[in-house]
Amino acid sequence: MGENLLKEIEKGSKMAVMKKKIITHYIYNGSSTITDLAREMDLSVPTVTKFIDEMCEEGYINDYGKLETSGGRHPSLYGLNADSGYFVGVEVRQFSINLGLINFKGDVVQLKMNVPFKAKNTPESLDELCKLIKHFLQKVSVEKDKILNINVNLSGRVNPDLGYSYSIFNFDERPLTDVISEKVGGYRVSIDNDTRAMIYGEYMQGVVKGEKNIIFINVSWGLGMGIIIDGKIYKGKSGFSGEFEHNFGYENEIICHCGKKGCIETEVSGAALHRILLEHINNGENSIISNTKKNLEDLTLDDIIDAVNKEDLLCIELVEEIGVKLGRHVAGLINIFNPELVIIGGALSRTGDYLTQPITTAIRKYTLNLMNRDSVIVESKLKERAGIIGACMLSRSKLFE
């Protein structure tokens, strides 16, 4: 059913384009009356009624029942039919992947979190990823022909429009989307940047409550930024926006994974925290990690976060130092973008106030007062689910926007 509409949209007929706009309206508004929809789309009520009747008959739209009003006729509410299509999201992280399935309305049907996987820029790693995706597809409880798209989140530079990744899985001349599609059984596939997916997840189902100008700071093993301007994800010309972590920040002679020296990420990231903590421990400073982790080569970011939340003083101090540094750089972003909302997310945000309070203090210190008054600093509501929820939501929105 949904596949038929997508084929219509690809042909570009006026009817299909109008149906696409109606679906997009319901993606962002949930439900509405025909009168409200006609006003929003600047069309006559009879024209919209014709489209809605046809889409109800085709199974894309449902009549949700009468809207309770104070008097007169009670208009009907319409919205998306949950069962007319499904969308898969895949979040690729450093040492695991998350997979999810949503229905046409955007309700989460299934999530599978923290599936072991090591992301490497090798054909073998890509093959393993595709095997995990295929296994998930085999286990989901929906008809396979109702799965309309699979969206994969990746870190680094991603061109979502062309389907190319430039930081990982970039060894094939073909678009990565084509390669993955071939390996998982011919499904439609899209890709996007991991932090853009996080901000979209928060925008659709998280902490965002009507704000239209938002920055999301992803502090995980690396560092990243997602941007929404006037209610739309900002990608830049080729999809590379948000790479502020590779701005020059420090005269430290540390070579970043991008190949340049002194990038912000070399001092402000989970990788930086990991490196600095090991330096302190090797210099003889005390930490519960020294007692619980016999082989420091196996130390993970999760181990450090657990130590912070167990009130390990050394780990707390180092997280706070990173918070101060990050706050200075975010202050600069606020001065540039003047956002309504700044969301702090990613793995390190699980340390809570130990990270966010120093960030907030530094922002107050280094932003212009007028800018500071406009911006609210909040923690991610979806936490570790932000990326996978965003991946699923992008899987849907990419087909209808």
Residue positions per predicted region:
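ATP-binding/phosphotransfer module of carbohydrate and carboxylate kinases, centering on a glycine-rich
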Residues: 1-73, 77-113, 117-145, 260, ...
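Short glycine-rich anion-binding loops that position phosphate/pyrophosphate groups of nucleotides
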Residues: 155-157, 220-222, 348
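Hydrophobic beta-strand positions
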Residues: 101, 157-158, 227
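Short glycine-aspartate micro-motif
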Residues: 87-91, 147-151, 214-218, 224-226
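Glycine/GP-enriched mid-protein hinge/lid loop-to-helix segment characteristic of carbohydrate kinases
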Residues: 111-113, 121-125, 181, 185-306
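Glycine-rich phosphate-binding loop and adjoining helix at the ATP-binding site
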Residues: 112-213, 354-365
